[in-house]
């Protein structure tokens, strides 16, 4: 049976933004010899692997590790150490530094309140995107960075359109440029798995929060 598409469906497909091409244009617009600063929120070392390999050719990067959603605390600390190890071991054309945000799980629980029952990938996740990106842009603004972004879009399970929508909204509010991205494009996710094997990175089997953990491990309930 042939699928039937409405004019609205076709128009939406035609108007769908290609964030990778937008990133290409942003990089191409940089003046020769210019190395702008990027405040990059990272969710974990594996997701940051390809992103850092790619963007460190063009930017001086600070990896901002702010993830109060991660459960339990032992998992959080394991991911922090893996992130720091990867940054130390990765050869990069331009400097990559590390900054850890406060780990206060209650900040995540507050933003997720009333959405605990929702499935992964919906409004609760969008609220979590916003929580982490707003913390990132505030720090980027305070520290005088040229751009901010997140590694989250590399995951096939993360909504790149929503991430860019939130990023652009925050950029307009705080006056720090958002670096458009969909890092899973051009085999970015595939490259991240290759780098994870190459560096022996710990790859967790759930996003990080207690709700995703319960979905992945129902036998523990």
Where are these regions (language model features)?
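Aromatic pocket-lining residues of Rossmann-like dinucleotide-binding sites
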Residues: 55
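Nucleotide-activated chemistry modules centered on ATP-dependent adenylation/adenylyltransferase
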Residues: 2, 6-50, 58-221
């Amino acid at each position: 049976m042939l699928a039937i598409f409405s004019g609205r469906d076709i128009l939406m497909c035609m108007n769908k933004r290609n964030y990778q091409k937008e990133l290409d244009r942003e990089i191409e617009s940089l003046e020769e010899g210019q190395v702008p600063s990027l405040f990059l929120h990272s969710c974990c070392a594996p997701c940051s692997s390809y992103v850092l390999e790619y963007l460190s050719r063009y930017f001086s990067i600070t990896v901002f590790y702010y993830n109060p959603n991660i459960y339990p605390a032992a998992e959080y600390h394991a991911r922090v150490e893996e992130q720091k190890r990867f940054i130390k071991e990765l050869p990069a054309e331009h400097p990559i530094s590390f900054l850890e945000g406060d780990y206060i799980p209650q900040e995540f629980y507050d933003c997720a309140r009333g959405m605990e029952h929702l499935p992964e990938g919906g409004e609760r996740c969008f609220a979590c995107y916003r929580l982490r990106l707003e913390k990132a842009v505030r720090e980027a603004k305070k520290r005088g960075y040229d751009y901010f972004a997140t590694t989250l879009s590399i995951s096939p399970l993360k909504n790149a359109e929503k991430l860019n929508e939130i990023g652009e909204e925050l950029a307009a509010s705080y006056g720090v440029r958002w670096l458009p991205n969909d890092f899973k494009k051009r085999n970015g996710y595939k490259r991240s798995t290759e780098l994870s094997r190459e560096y022996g990175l710990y790859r967790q089997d759930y996003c990080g929060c207690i709700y995703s953990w319960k979905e992945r491990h129902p036998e523990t309930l």
